[in-house]
């Protein structure tokens, strides 16, 4: 389709991420910026095995100079996976066993918030939520 946006898959290694403090890490790549902030949560964002880990009450901000209409996070380990919400647009239906979290809308910036409890994770005990992702595809 002529004029259609081309999907860009962002992958990374842990050393590509930078941080202004332990409570905030960011990645700038291919015209996009991802910022993960601890906010009121108990744990700082963490990178392990090139997977980003955002914990309960953290935010994941995706931004660009150009509008985008779709974001898909490829999930890592879903042990304590929680509900993910967005400040604009719509997050796709989430369920236990998911391998991705999707968003649709029209924006230059979206802020995702990590839920408090492990609503959809494989851990049956009620624990603090996590959002672990290993790549992001944006268009």
Residue ranges, per PLM feature:
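Short, surface-exposed beta-strand/strand-loop-strand elements in extracellular ectodomains
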Residues: 74-99
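Short beta-strand-plus-loop segments that form exposed binding edges in beta-rich domains
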Residues: 112-131
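Extracellular beta-strand elements of beta-rich domains used
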Residues: 71, 134-136
């Amino acid at each position: 389709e002529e004029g259609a946006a081309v999907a860009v898959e962002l992958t990374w290694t842990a050393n590509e991420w930078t941080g202004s403090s332990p409570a905030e890490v960011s990645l700038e790549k291919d015209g996009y910026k991802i910022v993960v902030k601890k906010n009121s949560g108990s744990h700082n964002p963490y990178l392990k095995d090139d997977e980003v880990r955002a914990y309960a009450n953290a935010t994941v901000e995706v931004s660009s100079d150009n509008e985008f209409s779709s974001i898909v996070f490829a999930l890592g380990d879903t042990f304590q996976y929680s509900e993910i919400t967005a400040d604009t647009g719509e997050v796709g239906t989430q369920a236990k066993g998911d391998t991705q979290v999707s968003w649709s809308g029209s924006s230059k910036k979206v802020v995702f918030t990590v839920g408090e409890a492990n609503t959809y994770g494989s851990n049956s005990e009620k624990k603090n939520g996590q959002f672990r992702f290993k790549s992001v595809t944006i268009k």
